[in-house]
């Protein structure tokens, strides 16, 4: 029977890195939104209305993406901590 080995510090570092990436995604989204906002005043009538609808969809999609990525990072961290605690508890049984 083979053993399954986990590198908990590396797994936690990966979760932290995922949180960093979610922050980067948020920053890129904010930059793009600022650029689009600068252009919005030039779009009027039907074009302006179409732009506003597109921008609302884009903003919502970006928020959902960032929220989902943060949730993945949090879940990864929580599961890693739970696995580590379980390993320690099982190890304590063996003295």
From Swiss-Prot:
Keyword presence, Amino-acid biosynthesis: no
Location(s) in or outside the cell: Secreted
Major site of localization recorded for this protein: secreted
GO cellular component: extracellular region
Taxonomy, superkingdom: Bacteria
Pfam families with a match to the protein in the record: WXG100
Signal peptide as annotated in the record: none
Keywords: Secreted
Protein family (similarity comment): Belongs to the WXG100 family. ESAT-6 subfamily.
Assembly with partners or alone: Forms a tight 1:1 complex with EsxG.
The protein's name: ESAT-6-like protein EsxH
Source organism (scientific name): Mycolicibacterium smegmatis (strain ATCC 700084 / mc(2)155)
């Amino acid at each position: 029977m083979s053993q399954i080995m986990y590198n908990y510090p590396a797994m936690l570092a990966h979760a932290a890195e995922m949180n960093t990436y979610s922050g980067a995604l948020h920053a890129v989204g904010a930059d793009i939104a600022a650029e689009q906002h600068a252009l919005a005043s030039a779009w009027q009538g039907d074009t302006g209305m179409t732009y506003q609808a597109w921008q609302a969809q884009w903003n919502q999609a970006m928020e959902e993406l960032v929220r989902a990525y943060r949730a993945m990072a949090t879940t990864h961290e929580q599961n890693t901590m739970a696995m580590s605690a379980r390993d320690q508890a099982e190890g304590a049984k063996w003295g």
